[in-house]
Amino acid sequence: MFQQQNQQLVIGKISEILDATDSSYAEKMTEMLDSAKRIFIAGAGRSKLVGNFFAMRLVHGGYDVSVVGEIVTPSIKAGDLLVIISGSGETEQLIAFTKNAKKVGANIVLISSRASSTIGDMADGVFQVGKQELYGKVVGMPMGTVFELSTLCFLEAIISHIIWEKGIPEEVMRERHANLE
């Protein structure tokens, strides 16, 4: 019984956050992704792991994507898009990435729990997942768990939107999936 209560707590909180997220974001994010020459994904800690999920699905969708910090990541240039995932929008390393990307003329998107932040002030687009007041302390969901899981679901919904809008068959996505595993 206790396990079911925990599952309902997690699912309920994620649903609450996603219900409070602007429904126009899917279209706006898709437009920004489509207009980019290349896409770079950055985050720190568990937010970076969420970014890895998103990067993989974007590759399956046919986008040219790199994850910041990997040894094979190329340099970002004008016309590229840097997608930053940061609950606070204040992570020092991600602020530095944002400044460097801005300096070369890349566009910046911030996915965050906050509408206003240092990174958000430099970004070309801010996608606030939920509303700040919904991120209070939740017993059983420590530290950034609520943001990370909500963002993972939000980004999966973006991928679903892209697949639907572009009519990408799963077979095509499978062909783009890694085959050296």
Q: What are these language model-derived features?
A:
Residues 1-19:
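Generic N-terminal amphipathic, Lys/Arg-enriched alpha-helix
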Residues 3, 22-25, 102:
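Residue-level recognition of alpha-helical structural elements
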Residues 7, 26-29, 51:
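Hydrophobic packing residues in well-ordered alpha-helices of helical domains and bundles
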Residues 19-35:
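A short, well-structured juxtamembrane/interface segment
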